A protein has these predicted regions:
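ATP-dependent carboxylate-amine ligase
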Residues: 1-45, 54-61, 71, 75, ...
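Phosphate-binding loop of NTP-binding sites
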Residues: 5-11, 30-36, 67-70, 83-228, ...
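Short, polar loop motifs at secondary-structure junctions
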Residues: 43-46, 64-66, 79-83, 103, ...
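Beta-strand->loop->alpha-helix junctions that form or flank phosphate-binding loops
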Residues: 61-64, 99-106, 144-147, 242-261, ...
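Redox-cofactor binding/interface segments in oxidoreductases and associated redox assembly factors
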Residues: 75-78, 166-167, 192, 228, ...
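Short glycine-rich anion-binding loops that position phosphate/pyrophosphate groups of nucleotides
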Residues: 80-82, 122, 170-173, 196-198, ...
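A conserved, hydrophobic alpha-helical segment in the catalytic core
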Residues: 183-197, 236-237, 278-314
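Short pre-catalytic strand/loop immediately N-terminal to key active-site residues, enriched for Gly-Thr
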Residues: 274-281, 328-332
Length: 444
């Protein structure tokens, strides 16, 4: 049965189904730190998550055979699992206690000051920037974030301070709870970076997504904060629909303004120079503005925030240089939506203005591979001299999409001598693309 059991007073045996995902693996980290005995099942276990779970002493069980399901006080069921899964059916038939990952996390952080970072783009980067600022001030912030940063050992930790930062996405919680994950977090500060249509596998249209954000806004207390950038009509429609918390429109009445041309942030009566920051592109600097203002609301001086971010190590797969030699550069980026692809392409063109750039875009998300973005998707990378579109799903949308990495590599091999920068964009395992390309470059 669905349980409301919290871990405030009990030390439990907890089994996580779907433990190898970033969220559930991060949840395992926090549960172990809280003193629980944790085990987990998944289809397969692979680094780096398998290494992280092993270091925590988590028993890992491959597959979902009913016979391999261990006894536990509580089962946490991941949103990738559905009815028909042997373990799920056994748990239901035996009326065992179960819950979702987001609900479990929400119960564990209920007594913390929660900063939830939501939106279609920039969640991971903004979350880590906030954590870097807090950590630089000696604040042992807790967090669970769906990415990897060299600034932190893991993508999750409990932390000892009052603050907890959570990457709050709008995907559903579990097969038995189709509400968005962020509805469970009850944030004190709710950041909405932007809202666009995505996740076509669970949302019919943009209004479906806006409804979930509206529900989340209704959970923010009257003394809480809702932060968003000026100019996003979708967010403004939500605020106008009903909001009971303090709102902060960055770039608007909050007197915090990003000037890309000047390379500065104007914050009230201060002028903050961004020239020494390691981030590239307006979208990343927007994340900086959001992180700095969030930190300001929680008592951190903007100059201290800026100083902390000058030492930022960034987030893996966010315009990350994965290879560089005398004449070739390979960049890996997580972009998987027309807006994100457009921003990443613009950043690459500005950063490598005199060099020939080609792009490889994998249509890996359901929304992309099923053609929901239409021509916007292909237009988003039109600034590049050449784009290779990789679609490994069974549904091809265009004749120029490659359904084989080997075929793509064969064509790239013909052009490689005339290429300076290769920009890979995918939200799946990009190493299957980057590693053979790097090998190709080395062997030329």
């Amino acid at each position: 049965m669905v349980t409301n059991v919290t871990d405030k007073y009990l030390k439990m045996k907890i089994h996580i189904l779907g433990i190898c995902g970033t969220f559930m693996g991060g949840l395992a980290q926090i549960l172990v730190e809280k003193g629980h005995t944790v085990s987990g099942s998944d289809k397969q276990f692979y680094p780096p998550m398998s290494n992280q779970l092993d270091s925590l002493g988590v028993e890992m069980i491959e597959g979902y055979e009913q016979s391999s399901l261990p006894s536990a006080d509580l089962y946490v069921i991941g949103n990738a699992l559905s009815r028909g899964n042997p373990c799920v059916e056994y748990i239901l038939n035996q009326k065992l206690d179960y819950t979702s990952g987001p609900k479990m996390l929400g119960e564990m952080i209920r007594d913390r000051t929660v900063i939830a970072v939501s939106g279609t783009h920039g969640k991971t980067s903004t979350s880590f920037l906030i954590c870097e600022i807090f950590q630089a001030q000696g604040i042992d912030v807790g967090f669970l974030i769906g990415g990897v940063s060299d600034s932190f050992e893991n993508s999750a930790r409990l932390g000892t301070s009052e603050f907890f930062v959570i990457e709050a996405d709008e995907y559903d919680s579990a097969f038995f709870d189709k509400r968005s994950k962020f509805i469970h977090y009850h944030p004190d500060t709710f950041i909405i970076n932007n809202i666009e249509f995505d996740h076509a596998d669970i949302f019919d249209d943009l209004s479906d997504i806006l409804k979930q954000f509206h529900h989340a806004i209704r959970t923010v207390p009257a003394n809480g904060n809702i932060l968003f950038h000026d100019g996003d009509e979708n967010i403004m429609s939500l605020i106008e629909k009903g909001c009971w918390s303090h709102t902060h429109k960055l770039g608007g009445e909050e007197n915090i303004m990003l000037s890309i041309e000047e390379g500065v942030i104007y914050f009230k009566d201060q002028r903050l120079d961004l020239s020494d920051l390691p981030m590239h592109g307006q979208h990343n600097l927007n994340n900086v503005v959001m992180a700095m203002y969030t930190s300001f609301l929680h008592g951190i001086d903007p100059h201290k925030s800026l100083s902390a971010l000058k030492n930022s190590k960034g987030v893996k797969r966010r315009f990350e240089t994965v290879f560089k030699n005398n004449d070739k550069i390979v960049i890996d980026d997580f972009a998987h939506h027309p807006t994100a692809i457009s921003h990443t392409v613009e950043t690459a063109i500005n950063h490598f203005s005199s060099q020939k750039i080609v792009g490889i875009v994998e249509l890996a998300s359901n929304t992309m591979s099923q053609g929901h973005h239409g021509s916007k998707l292909y237009d988003s990378a039109s600034g590049l001299e050449q784009v290779y579109w990789l679609n490994l799903s069974s549904r091809k949308n265009q004749n120029f999409e490659y359904d084989s990495i080997n075929l793509l590599l064969e064509d790239l091999k013909q052009d490689i001598d005339n290429v300076d920068v290769i920009l890979i964009m995918s939200n799946k395992d990009s190493k299957k693309i980057s590693e053979p390309i790097i090998e190709l470059i080395k062997n030329k």
